[in-house]
């Protein structure tokens, strides 16, 4: 009982702006399919778009409904090309779908770059104004932040938000 009480006191709420601040620490990390390693003084790291979301959630101590790190559910056996419904199914197990007109800073966005949705990004408030994306862009070869352009908006298919329980962190 005492351990549970101590654990409850140690929890802190993670805000949407903290999610974005943490994601920005990944800027410049190189692209690597299925990678999960943030850049550091030791090297450039390597991450893909899903790895960025998993890494940020892990660094912030975000949990699933049972109190396990969200990264525990991470999968790295996926193709570079969409597998019908797999990504949407995995995301919807852990994140709450929200209407596109309700998306806000810190939300996870899903894009269709080919036939099926296959790319994720975090929504930010872009430093020069307007909405932005923080994502691992394979074309850029690294994690970048860029404006949410009309091109990206046309490819946007879904928006998700971390559930309130997940925003309780043990860190």
Question: What are the roles of these predicted feature ranges?
Answer:
Residues 9-96, 100, 105, 112-114, ...:
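N-terminal capping segments
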Residues 118, 138-164:
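Short, Lys/Arg-rich amphipathic alpha-helical interaction segments
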């Amino acid at each position: 009982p005492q351990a549970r009480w101590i654990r409850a006191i140690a929890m802190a709420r993670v805000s949407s702006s903290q999610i974005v601040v943490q994601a920005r620490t990944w800027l410049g990390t190189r692209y690597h399919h299925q990678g999960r390693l943030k850049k550091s003084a030791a090297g450039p790291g390597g991450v893909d778009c899903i790895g960025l979301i998993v890494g940020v959630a892990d660094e912030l101590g975000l949990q699933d409904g049972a109190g396990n790190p969200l990264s525990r559910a991470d999968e790295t056996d996926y193709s570079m090309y969409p597998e019908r419904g797999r990504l949407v199914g995995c995301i919807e197990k852990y994140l709450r779908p929200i209407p596109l007109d309700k998306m806000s800073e810190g939300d996870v966005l899903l894009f269709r770059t080919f036939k099926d949705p296959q790319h994720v990004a975090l929504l930010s408030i872009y430093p020069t104004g307007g909405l932005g994306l923080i994502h691992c862009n394979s074309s850029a070869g690294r994690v970048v932040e860029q404006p949410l352009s009309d091109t990206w908006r046309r490819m946007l298919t879904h928006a998700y938000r971390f559930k309130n329980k997940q925003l309780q962190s043990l860190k």
